[in-house]
Design a protein with these regions (language model features):
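Conserved structural position within tetratricopeptide repeats
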Residues: 1-2, 32-36, 79-80, 119
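Short coil turns that delineate tetratricopeptide repeat
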Residues: 5, 39-41, 83-89, 122-123
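Start-of-helix signal in alpha-solenoid helical-repeat scaffolds, especially tetratricopeptide repeats
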Residues: 8, 44-51, 85-92, 127
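TPR repeat positional signature
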Residues: 11, 47-55, 95, 114, ...
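Residue-level recognition of tetratricopeptide repeat
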Residues: 16, 52-60, 100, 135
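Structural motif corresponding to the intra-repeat A-B loop/turn of tetratricopeptide repeats
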Residues: 21, 57-65, 104-105
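Alpha-solenoid helical repeat scaffolds
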Residues: 32, 73-76, 115
Length: 148
């Protein structure tokens, strides 16, 4: 393993240590460094760092545009790589937060994301995605009916 490939591992370990010491802000900075050190999110550790950054935004109850973009990126990569973190409590809450934002926007983006996430192997996540997909489809059909 080359030194560059080890960076996400080191940042994740540092972030986890700082979090265990109650230093949440410093941990979040370490996770952000871990995410940036794995630009293409090729490593599990880089994806976990991004998940922890997304989770911090969800836990604060504030999702800005960049937070939504990061969360969607993480959801897509976690699904593509079949990361178990997507099925974790934090992962499902990130999923729900993003879908909630997309629901407020009208559902089109959410429906597209649901189609991608249907490929994830965990039954619980697929069921959650199916619920959101039905909501978006219903919302889209109602908005189509209203436009006529």
């Amino acid at each position: 393993m080359r030194a560059r490939e080890k960076l996400p591992v080191l940042w994740l370990a540092l972030g986890d240590f700082l979090r265990s010491e109650g230093k949440e802000e410093q941990a979040l900075e370490a996770y952000a460094h871990g995410r940036r050190s794995d630009g293409r999110l090729e490593s599990r550790e880089g994806r976990v760092c991004l998940m922890r950054v997304c989770w911090a935004s969800v836990a604060r109850g504030v999702l800005g545009e960049e937070d939504v973009r990061n969360a969607v990126l993480w959801l897509r990569e976690a699904c593509a790589c079949q990361d178990g973190e997507l099925a974790s409590e934090e992962g499902v809450k990130i999923l729900r937060a993003v879908m909630g934002v997309y629901e407020e926007r009208g559902g089109g983006e959410g429906l597209e994301l649901c189609k991608e996430l249907e490929k994830y192997s965990d039954v619980g996540v697929r069921e959650e995605v199916a619920v959101w997909k039905r909501r978006f489809e219903k919302e889209m059909s109602v908005s189509m009916d209203c436009s006529e």
